[in-house]
Amino acid sequence: MVRDPVNTVVAVDNDGTTTHVRTVKPMSRLNSTNSQNTVTFVDSKSNDKGNDRQTQPKKVPTGRLCQEGDTVDLDTPMSSHERRHLLFLATSRDRWRSHKVHNYCPACILRRPEYGLPCGHMYCEYDIRRLGRKIGRETYAVEECTCCQARFTDVVFKFRPKTKGIRVLALDGGGVRGIIMLQCLHMLQSMLWVFLPGMPIIDLFDVCAGTSSGEVEAGGVKKSGICALSLAHKGMSVKKAIQDFTDLSQRVFVSQPIWARAFNLIARGSIYGSSAIDEALKRHYGESKLSDYTPATARAAKILVTVKGTPKGDHILSNFNGVGLDNSHKDFEQTFCHPDDEEGQKAILAWEAARSTSAAPVIFPTFTIDGVGTFQDGAMWRNNPTDVALSLVPALTQGHCLPDILLSIGTGFEKRLQRGHREPQPPTRVTIPLIDLLRRLYAFMGDNIVTDGEKFHNHIMAGRSDVGSRFRRLNVPLSEGYPSLDDASSIPRLMDEAAAHFKSHPGLQEVLDSIISSFFYFEVSSRPIRHRTHVSFCGRILCDIQPGHRLKKFIKDLRIRGAEFSINGKFTALDSVGEWNGREVYFEIPVRGTVAGLHTQLEIFLCWNMLGRQSKEMISRSPFSLNEIMESQGWDSPQSRALRQPVRSG
């Protein structure tokens, strides 16, 4: 028999008092069925510190404090105008079967579409929620396309809860050094599987940004930009990505004598031709478009890769169709489909995006997407795409400017001598001027802040002190220096150096701690009540893991490690939840208390013991105010527009 998950309410008062209050009737959740029952609430002002007797709680009706009827979705039934429009779409299904649009959502004609269905039609998040069948918390199954009436099975979208922050993954470029990044993700995933067996590490991140090799690793060109496409868009496992990376690197980067490399460079402007890499990427990605229904769009993840226009222009190629970008972003352009595509038939293919961002000068020729432009390696603009991904956070989290965690992974760096310990430089040898020029240009490209991911990381940290502990950087010092971008023989050495470095480095454990704590988030259950001296609220701490064996094991392992929540400095253990069946019931802990005002910051931490080491990390989006949480939930928005986001027109 399944027991209710919660039989204790945590009451937190702004005078520093925390009390675990036994309810008259255990509540599986706060809903309209139990909201009229009387629960006990301890008034902190009635505590007598000089009396050891237990203070008698006073009873207050919970009809206004704890009704979930106000909280769940804030959705309203469709209006007559909306129903009439959907009926018109259904009657025009023959035309819509061959007509697809990418610049507006056909169901509402108000917003840009973000989520593609297997038939090729795209809808915005609001209408996916409206047209889909809700099968779980923030989870919707779409069984039919409104436009063409095509029917589907297993087309499910899981959206991020409104009050939950986002996790960002940024992957540097670096040719074959991209194997370092994959090895890092593999080791981090192994640590994660202790708590969440079988969960792909890439599924933890809401925004994935890559450049150069971070995206093609599985396509045969080993650069760091293609990982974002292979791991997230294609849903490839890290283990398979490592194997494909190694095999295809050796296939594409065929060893050539010096004279052959020089001849190819002079004859066609690159050491390698387009055919080898193009065919490898086509086989890997097929005809998949950035707009297709993929493992990434199924969990509402945003993927982007950076590319450099030729002769100029900075661009990102993404799967989110410009949603989240506004006119303030003047330093780069977003490209999703062919700008002259009126019929919606020319969305950019995944392999084209991978090929564009991997076109490293000298190594591969530039790549032209018909009707869009000619592009080269994104590392020429952003070898470390951290700031590009970070610029999207406010729009994706309704104004909250900081992610829960921003994980930036490098592809190795050379150890530099500390200031004051420089070795004397030998005098410059007399060389042929052209050769000397090429040598200096090569050295400049490798030591430039744009192409040196580690330098750019330090630059961001110096200018974004607000990011602080949320920004994690993982990289490996290379004892033998940088291998060339196409040196496939260096892959085993790079993997060994990465494994040895991260085995003893605390950085991976710190990243894991932040990820684990960010599974938990807070939302208000009813509208807070303003009193003369304070504001009382009713909320709950939730976990963004679906009920099942995975959730049950996750909570069990945290309990074993003595996990507890710190709410404004006061603690409540996970054991206070009592007996709970995580295979069938969502995790939640109701929290009631008082704060000085709606704008008062509320801090919630998850604390636990890991191998004798105490860990304390903020839950998702903490610290926050009640006003921020209410705004994210849409309390003060017109109900029919609560989920609608303003987007850039055009």
Model-predicted segments: where are they?
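Conserved catalytic cores and adjacent C-terminal regulatory segments
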Residues: 2-5, 14, 29-35, 41-43, ...
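Short linear proline/tyrosine/threonine-rich motifs used for host-factor recruitment
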Residues: 9-11, 18-21
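Long C-terminal appendages of very large multidomain proteins
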Residues: 20-26, 604
